[in-house]
Amino acid sequence: MKIVYQISKEFRDIEGSICISGSKSESNRLLLLRAYTSYFKILNLSDSDDTQLMISAIESDKKEINVGHAGTAMRFLTAYFSSITKKSRVLTGSDRMRQRPISILVDALKDMGCDIEYLEKNGFPPLKINGKNI
């Protein structure tokens, strides 16, 4: 049985700011939300390395992005780069990151029409992501 979810977006601008607790988890989720929408200000954004990495990766035009040890960034950016950009990107990480499975997410994204390839070991980063609007 295949379950299909349809997500649509309204084309309205968001204005204002969001004040958060400063946690890395909240910060990274809101950065991704902001990347999908019009700009809004996030107050009390975490200054963690993972959050700084998310900011630079979202804003980057580089073809290869290294997330180091940041597992949340690897997963969030896999979905983000798969779904919005019409560019090819390589998403990689540390030696340890390349030992962490990511096939459940990649399989789900492929089922939605995303174009993702494993560059080394099947089921693990690094990934080549050929982005497209889904």
Give residue spans per PLM region.
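Structural preference for solvent-exposed beta-strand-turn elements
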Residues: 1-134
